Amino acid sequence: PLSTWGAYIIGTMGGLFEDEGYALHSGFSGFLAAVPFQFYPMTALIMVLLTVLYRRHIGSMRHYEAYTDEDDSKLEALEEEMPEERETGVSHWALIVTVLSLVVMTLFMMVWNAGFNLGEVLNQDITVPLFFGGLTAFIVALGFAFTARNVHLGEIFKTAALGIGAMAKSAVLILVLAWMVSGAIQDLDAGSHIADAIESVNFSTTVIPVVMFLVAGGMAFATGTSWGAFGILLPIAVPLAVSTDPTMMPVLIAAVLGGAVFGDHSSPVSDTTVLSATGAGAKLHAHFISQLPYALISALIAALAYLVYGLSGMLLLAYAVMAIGLFLYVKLTKAHAA
């Protein structure tokens, strides 16, 4: 929750809960309640660990791994292209202290806003505390930058301006558009209309979680952003849960969030895909093709888990499905020789 991503989701959920008269959760507590149902992120993280431990390289990734193993000069060429590191005299503790300042200040401001009443902390709007936490971390980072060697003052502010500009051109614009769409959807009362349609055709509510997961994934894949999927589908998922089964609220929220993250991970036009490829020094197409099978397998396992939970209402059974799916992933794929 201590991120712009978390703040946006929590703020959106809080407003939707208030509009729908849903009093079981605040935006923050609703966000936390959805964590146990985040089947896709859990599966993806565990799959990363299993892939590393058991060297499960599938699809084009197997080809790229074999290619670099056969010719180490390819890796050496990449290393030569990397920019030369400069000795700045700044300890690695600078990063740790900066991150800690963000967390500590954010938590302090949450407690402050709650009047030091710990029981009310989860009901607070995290947006303002997160702003002060980010501002504090920025000031701390500037302090470390000023003490660094071989780093000029103009370079520091140029880097800060580039970071602000990148956010303004991408994340801020996406947020504004998402809020516009979200407001339009609420004015149209789309969630209630969908709920009425489900009831009129006797559509089983047990499959709603997996449907929301797949729709969010497809939407984020097509648009290249999870933020837009959040803004469009959360205003549908919340009133849908209120109208059909309020106890399904956490799992529906998790399905939307997890599906949007899956689509964002998989999309060739996603900023995360571009940044990952750039950071790894890989071509965008090669990165997209090589990571897609892993994301699809994780999404398939997560979809089955949502389906099983919707049919049974048992979280442990959904976890069992995830465990079986990951076990089959390891058993049915071949290890890549070291």
Locate each region found by the language model.
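Short helical (or helix-break) motifs at transmembrane helix termini and adjacent helical loops
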Residues: 260-275
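Transmembrane helix boundary and interhelical junction motifs in multipass membrane proteins
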Residues: 1-9, 224-236, 268-272
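Hydrophobic alpha-helical transmembrane segments of multi-pass integral membrane proteins
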Residues: 172-178, 202-240, 244, 249, ...
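Membrane-interfacial loop-to-helix junctions in multi-pass transporters
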Residues: 37-39, 92, 130-131, 164-172, ...
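Alpha-helical transmembrane segments
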Residues: 33-51, 125-138, 249-264
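Helix-loop-helix module between adjacent transmembrane segments
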Residues: 1-4, 38-41, 178-186, 219-225, ...
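Membrane-core helix-loop-helix motifs of multi-pass transport proteins
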Residues: 1-70, 86-93, 273-329
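Hydrophobic transmembrane alpha-helices of multi-pass small-molecule transporters
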Residues: 39-41, 52-53, 69-180, 297-338
